[in-house]
Amino acid sequence: ADDPIRYWRDKQGREMDFVLSRGRDVVHAIECKWSADALDGSALKAFRALYPKGQNYLVTPSANEAYQIRKSDMDITVCDLGSLLGLL
């Protein structure tokens, strides 16, 4: 069976748009923004403090092709929705 797509939010109000469990202790984090510049990284950093294993994705319509950025000491794959489906 496929693992469900979930949402994550902590008591401080930081949230991840989507989280996907992929095996034992591996959770992919997915944020959706209009542009890569809109990501501040604080929610992702808080999420990764609790769930350190997994890939980080930023989905934006402005990404013509997938590329990597580093923010808040984390590697993040920036891509559009079509590319994300291929990466997962």
Where are these regions (language model features)?
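A cross-kingdom feature that marks ATP-driven nucleic-acid transaction machinery
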Residues: A1-L88
